[in-house]
A protein has these predicted regions:
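Interfacial loop-to-transmembrane-helix boundary motif in multi-pass membrane proteins
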Residues: 81-89, 106-115, 124-149, 167, ...
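Interfacial transmembrane-helix termini
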Residues: 19-23, 37-59, 77-87, 97-117, ...
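Hydrophobic, glycine- and aromatic-enriched re-entrant/interface helices and adjoining loop segments
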Residues: 160-178, 248-338, 360, 364
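Central hydrophobic cores of alpha-helical transmembrane segments in multi-pass inner-membrane proteins
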Residues: 35-36, 59-73, 91-98, 115-128, ...
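Loop-to-helix entry and N-terminal half of a specific, functionally important transmembrane alpha helix
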Residues: 352-391, 397
Length: 431
């Protein structure tokens, strides 16, 4: 009987570890390259007088070169076969680069550097994640550094747009949003702590860490990011416990706390009083959202073309209104494709979680993909007034170096779930 059970276990394990046929990355890369060249041509054709043609050509040439170099090295020399996650990241980053270059030609190199730094974060983090023992050892130092970074930001950050979440260095030369970097650390610490949950002490430590992070963000008045952190905490807790009742109690407690804050801190409620009333505040608080609704639909299925939109003239168009710009200048088809890519990352994480090497990789990947999808939902539905507007960025596409590095860090957590990512485990699977 025991032999039969053992045999069944081996069959189940083999079924879980079975190779799934990877996508044809070369065809998709060629298609993506053609799309990016088309974007560059549009910017050169429709750009204003401030467009420096040499800069545009150089930026896109460098970006495409980096893309191809990455795939040639990892597919040709390192013999990797699965590139679904990287294709999505490069596709979205390319759209962000095109929008930023089109609206702010002088910031083209800055955005390109942000993407390169993000790719660097992706590669380094993948190496760190290759060893689960290394991950567990780094858990506490990462947690301490994360709290320290948020406290430092709270003390020294400048108040920008009502929130104290930016560290400005060199008279505006460089600005860092530490909460973006802590997003990756938040999932890293949570997944590593709950990887082998053996005591209430470990769970308590993570709860203290999570509450501290959310509390500091709330004090900074960065409510959108605080909501994202809370959502991620709920996802991680559910993935580890699977207890719906516990999750319900956590959410109920948070709701009661939120109502209390809105009651005793009226200035917080005032930030959301235009929700569902943007047309009544069309020239004040609802100015950006009203323009987004008007201009984004004018793009139709195929868009007006880069440089031809009107939304680009609105304040923070490449940050807070990025999805509207995609709709207006790229069209509904590309905009819908962008949304589908975030859904695809969630599906990818769930699909590969059954064959991950440990619960850390399953928790980290599912939490990271859920965070990206939730943030996208907040951005899209907030800008269109279906949800209260929090001003969160659209992952990969909104302009910003901190956000870009965070997004590449999150996709590293997603990528690590696939055993084919690491050569030594790839051999085990084939065997």
């Amino acid at each position: 009987m025991s032999k039969k059970i053992q045999k069944d276990k081996k069959k189940t394990h083999k079924r879980k570890m079975r190779y799934r046929r990877p996508v044809n990355w070369l065809f998709l890369l060629l298609l993506m390259t053609a799309f990016q060249i088309f974007c560059a041509i549009q910017i050169l054709t429709n750009g204003g007088e401030d467009i420096v043609k040499g800069t545009i050509i150089a930026v896109f040439a460098l970006y495409i070169t980096v893309e191809w170099t990455y795939f040639i090295v990892f597919a040709g020399f390192l013999r990797r076969k699965s590139f679904e996650v990287e294709l999505i990241a490069f596709f979205l980053s390319g759209i962000g680069l095109a929008l930023t270059t089109s609206v702010y030609p002088n910031k083209a190199y800055t955005q390109l550097i942000a993407i390169l730094l993000g790719i660097g974060v992706f590669i380094v983090l993948l190496w760190i994640l290759s060893d689960i023992d290394r991950v567990v050892k780094l858990r506490m130092p990462v947690a301490i550094l994360s709290i320290a970074a948020l406290v430092f930001t709270l003390i020294f950050a400048k108040n920008i747009n009502g929130a104290r979440n930016w560290i400005v260095i060199g008279n505006g030369l460089l600005s860092i949003q530490t909460s973006e970097i802590v997003k990756v650390a938040f999932i890293f610490v949570g997944a590593a702590t709950l990887e082998t949950l053996q005591s209430t002490k470990l769970l308590t430590k993570y709860i203290i860490f999570a509450v501290t992070c959310v509390g500091l963000l709330f004090i900074m008045k960065d409510f959108g990011t605080a909501l994202i952190f809370f959502f991620t905490f709920v996802i991680i807790a559910f993935l580890r416990s699977g207890d719906i009742k516990t999750i319900f109690l956590i959410c109920a407690g948070a709701l009661i706390g939120g109502i209390g804050v809105l009651t005793f801190k009226p200035y917080v409620a005032n930030r959301f009083n235009s929700y569902c009333h943007i047309w009544e505040f069309a020239d004040t608080k609802g100015y950006q959202q009203v323009r987004l609704l008007i201009y984004s639909v004018s793009g139709g299925l195929f868009g007006l073309g880069l440089g031809n939109g009107k939304l680009r003239g609105i304040y923070a168009s490449t940050e807070d209104l990025a999805f509207g710009m995609v709709c207006e200048e790229f069209g509904i088809i590309i905009a819908f494709t962008v949304l589908l890519t975030f859904v695809a990352l969630v599906v990818y994480s769930i699909r590969y979680s059954v064959a991950s090497r440990s619960s850390f990789y399953s928790i980290a990947a599912c939490a990271a993909s859920a965070l990206l999808l939730f943030q996208t939902a907040l951005h899209v539905f907030g800008a269109t007034d279906l949800l209260p507007w929090t001003g969160v960025t659209l992952p990969f596409i909104s302009r910003g170096g901190s956000s870009m590095m965070c997004c590449w860090g999150l996709v590293a957590l997603i990528k690590a779930i696939d055993v084919k990512t690491y050569k030594r485990y790839d051999k085990v699977v084939k065997g």
